[in-house]
Amino acid sequence: MRAVLSQKTTPLPRYLWPGHLSGPRRLTWSWCSDHRTPTCRELGSPHPTPCTGPARGWPRRGGGPCGFTSAGHVLCGYPLCLLSGPIQGCGTGLGDSSMAFLSRTSPVAAASFQSRQEARGSILLQSCQLPPQWLSTEAWTGEWKQPHGGALTSRSPGPVAPQRPCHLKGWQHRPTQHNAACKQGQAAAQTPPRPGPPSAPPPPPKEGHQEGLVELPASFRELLTFFCTNATIHGAIRLVCSRGNRLKTTSWGLLSLGALVALCWQLGLLFERHWHRPVLMAVSVHSERKLLPLVTLCDGNPRRPSPVLRHLELLDEFARENIDSLYNVNLSKGRAALSATVPRHEPPFHLDREIRLQRLSHSGSRVRVGFRLCNSTGGDCFYRGYTSGVAAVQDWYHFHYVDILALLPAAWEDSHGSQDGHFVLSCSYDGLDCQARQFRTFHHPTYGSCYTVDGVWTAQRPGITHGVGLVLRVEQQPHLPLLSTLAGIRVMVHGRNHTPFLGHHSFSVRPGTEATISIREDEVHRLGSPYGHCTAGGEGVEVELLHNTSYTRQACLVSCFQQLMVETCSCGYYLHPLPAGAEYCSSARHPAWGHCFYRLYQDLETHRLPCTSRCPRPCRESAFKLSTGTSRWPSAKSAGWTLATLGEQGLPHQSHRQRSSLAKINIVYQELNYRSVEEAPVYSVPQLLSAMGSLCSLWFGASVLSLLELLELLLDASALTLVLGGRRLRRAWFSWPRASPASGASSIKPEASQMPPPAGGTSDDPEPSGPHLPRVMLPGVLAGVSAEESWAGPQPLETLDT
């Protein structure tokens, strides 16, 4: 590399280290108070040279006291040289380097550069006068090489002996020894400390460039360029490689932006569907032996309880009056027979005759019939109306009937068989007779005597011959004709340990027929939160079940309604179990309970009560699908011997020839296969990730690692923002104006330990120790060198060509 000559006069560098100039007059120098003007004095003399102003140098081309210097300076009457080539001075601390002298009378400055390509100036570090003994003035040609061994060699003839330089470390910690070394012909120099706080030490010496653990780009442009060049996202590199073509760059930028908008839109739709938690119904078929479910059978003919026979007679009389007034029908027959069976001791009873049947309105050809219910004060009344007169009469009669049953003692129980015979005439399973222990009996106030077939039977094969066969007696003499108009058998199939709610899930079998009930079982598995609202065995349900059975939603709804009625009406409905400490509703104790009950029941039907939300479905339950086929039984040809045979088994004598007094029911499994219906989420976590990956791959060809690259870009951008912001704040802090000192004094005040000796001071020591370099922010530019370049670390030693 050839030296580049400066074409302008430059000021003396302010970071020149104060020290000794060993020469004819043994001079020493220091800075004046402005830190721009040097002052010199002879050792032992108290009179320094005056501070007349900054010393300046002059440019020279080839020759002169410095030979090939780019700029010359005069210090204390001696010419001082600034070299513009990549020469490392002794003692710089920037690596093993050598010192070069141009003559015996010219001190030399060592120069350091950031790189060979950017060597645009020089840095003056330290000057020593005497050259090494092996170098003569006549031997100098101006061309020097740096050999591999680290010592300087000359192209001029003659022997050359290497000499080890002195280093910066010795200058910093042992300034006296360093000055002595320079007197022996070795020069030491040091690069100025890096700008920063005064307490920050200079960077440690390094050999060459070493990559740090974490390195950031210099600017956001460089960061974005690196990302677009190396990212695995498709289309990103087009934003960089097409920079020379603005049309392509703009087009690819718009395409990338459009793809990003489309990706965000589709991801939004995907997450919206996922947050709604949709489910799939997965149906699978399994084949295994199954236990037969329970079957409850009721005769549909409730009995008249003996303690309230008189009350029921009064109710029948009141009902006949209402029907006569509405439809002109005479129902007075049978009153004497009922009066004869009235017991002497009866509970107190009050029949509310204000609640009577009446015509409400005419809607064209349809007549509405109903009754009015009012609260205890009579200020709030409403009509419960029906378009069917039969339904109106039955509901009105049922209301008064339940009001009377509430007067029964809590320990009262009715017999479950009729006096004329048994309800179940025969029972068999798979050709074997049933046992009495396989039946459970109870009395229902509305559906009469009921039997639950509770045999532990496992279905071996499908078909009628492998199921349960029952022959039942159908009683045609109703005890409460206004309460039930049914002539037949009430049947309900339900799971084990479940309460049969006959008013909701039962069906009827008419007399004189054979009904075959085929069962198909479905197992339902529901998902809990967050996909649905279900409970496992009643866990987490706020409602306390009043039935001593397993959890079902219907049992929970009934219990919830009864508890709300006790809280609202101060009494409970008779057809449901009571909570602890409550009593049933009756007009004798609660005159307006009917108004409260029907209001609450209407809210339950319209889902305005909280019972629906309080009673979730079971997460796992068995649902029975029933299909029924009927035929006439017994047939005309077999009726004689069939009825005669059944007469010996308990059929009443007067019913021997009456087909309408019998019914046959077969309960079988339609098939042993059962269906399992399981809910599954539409978007599980793996499916959601798969859908997201498909969309990212469709629009950008990206993967999870591509997303990590984006995350890395965001982290780098955040770190770079903090670094640049910190630099700007530090620059603003150090450039903030300080308080102006006294006139003629410098605003730069080094530390006391680093101040040079005063200009007028005297010392008898012939070799005073040199002070430390003041840690101040000084310009790093001489002949075009930037401040960042002047503080840069060393590069590998290069050869200077002049």
Curated annotation (Swiss-Prot):
Gene name of the encoded protein: SCNN1D
Other known facts: The additional delta/SCNN1D subunit exists only in some organisms.
A biological-process GO annotation: regulation of blood pressure
Organism from which the protein derives: Homo sapiens
Segments crossing the lipid bilayer: 251-271, 695-715
Organism placement in taxonomy: Eukaryota, Metazoa, Chordata, Craniata, Vertebrata
SUBUNIT field: Can form an alternative heterotrimeric epithelial sodium channel (ENaC), composed of a delta (SCNN1D), beta (SCNN1B), and gamma (SCNN1G) subunit, where the delta (SCNN1D) subunit replaces the alpha (SCNN1A) subunit.
Designated name of the protein: Epithelial sodium channel subunit delta
UniProt topological domain (Cytoplasmic) ranges: 1-250, 716-802
Gene3D superfamilies: Acid-sensing ion channels like domains, YojJ-like
